[in-house]
Amino acid sequence: MLKFDIQHFAHKKGGGSTSNGRDSESKRLGAKRADGQFVTGGSILYRQRGTKIYPGTNVGRGGDDTLFAKTDGVVRFERMGRDKKKVSVYPEVQEA
């Protein structure tokens, strides 16, 4: 009597896995208002992580470091020395 030793092997190898294939959603950081633009109080001026730009006159800083206007006025991006920047909001002067 004959005995056959039959073994079955995969004719297609396993696909394996990869550690890539995902990306985080963009946070939409950066300037939201331009220099010289008129803004109302509460308007977001700059979204950032950390203090890339510092708050100046009439500008507040939120819990996530977002800069916002405290009053109505014109936006001005200014330098603080050689390596720092700030954003200020100056109220428009009403001429009589």
UniProtKB/Swiss-Prot annotation:
Biased amino acid composition, Basic and acidic residues: 22-33
Protein name: Large ribosomal subunit protein bL27
Keywords, alphabetical: Ribonucleoprotein, Ribosomal protein
InterPro entries associated with the record: Ribosomal_bL27, Ribosomal_bL27_CS
Signal peptide per UniProt: none
Gene Ontology molecular function: structural constituent of ribosome
Protein family membership: Belongs to the bacterial ribosomal protein bL27 family.
HAMAP family attached to this UniProt entry: Ribosomal_bL27
Top-level taxonomy: Bacteria, Bacillati, Bacillota, Bacilli, Bacillales
Any one of the GO BP annotations: translation
Post-translational modification: The N-terminus is cleaved by ribosomal processing cysteine protease Prp.
Single GO cellular component term: cytosolic large ribosomal subunit
PANTHER family listed in its UniProt record: LARGE RIBOSOMAL SUBUNIT PROTEIN BL27M, RIBOSOMAL PROTEIN L27
Record carries keyword Hydrolase: no
Pfam families per UniProt: Ribosomal_L27
Region feature (Disordered): 1-33
Organism for this UniProt entry: Listeria monocytogenes serovar 1/2a (strain ATCC BAA-679 / EGD-e)
Paired cysteines (S-S): none
Propeptide: 1-9
Keyword Ribonucleoprotein: yes
